[in-house]
Amino acid sequence: MQTEIEIKFFVSQDIQQSLSNLLNSIGIISNAQVELGNVYFDTPTLDLRRLEMGLRIRRSDDFAEQTIKCRGQVVGGLHARPEYNAPVHGDVPMLSAFPDDIFPSLAVRDEIQGKLVAQFRTDFLRRHWLIAFEGAEIELAWDQGEIVGSLGKTAINELELELKSGDASALFALAERLAGLGGVRLGAQSKAQRGYRLAGLGKPLALQSLPVVNGVDAAMRITSGLQHWQHHEQYWLEQADPEQRRLALQEIRQGIALVIEAAGMLVAPTWLDALITQSAHLALLAQDVVEPEWQMALSALFHRAEYVRLQLAIAAWLHATA
């Protein structure tokens, strides 16, 4: 078992040259590229999803592996999930290849095994680099391809930083450099989450009420606020209706307000002043009734380096205080 610690970015513009320039300025240990095909499995009644597990078979020309990912945490684009890998023979994963204790019982495991079916797939080109950075080894992967489900397909264009060894502070420091590429933003949704939705098996993104945080400490309040903020950022980007976008912006501002309120209970974090400034800027955008200028401005903001770095700073603070 390993706990995968990674930071994911969604890419919205051509970063080929700027990424190449960045890579030329840091220490590359090795690099390669590979075409990957992934098929995700669950039962027709989504028993694995209810257990907060994701199961796939990944193949390339000379490689096949089954992976199960268990319940983890996503905060500010930082994904931390236990995962287990095993060789695979055939077209259906064998759950007995994984540790018994990750399942509620062997009877449950065997029942799920008998009902496994393919639900969706992802196919992409992965270019990856192993990087020596600030005393750590970090893998940078650039995935470009598509997710295919029964309801259609959607593009994959993602950067992922995975900590292989060393301290997570180096991971965040390199993520800050990537934010400077422009046209990238932190991604809280995994390929599997997006795939379930494309297969008609996951709930569509929707507006959510701010969570009740009475009786929890400041760090948990900040976590809740950041998650609320990022959820509605993604919702905003997926909507075309201006009214839905205005409602999403209201929720983004509420999430940020919760983070600011909770941070005020502490010795002021270094990112607090920048967040207050950002909150004021969003308040001005919320008052703008001119279409489509305010929407264009907000879309650009979501991909701006200083905006992404602010979210990264909050996520890094949360990781350091956990």
Where are each of the predicted segments found?
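Function-determining surface determinants
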Residues: 1-322
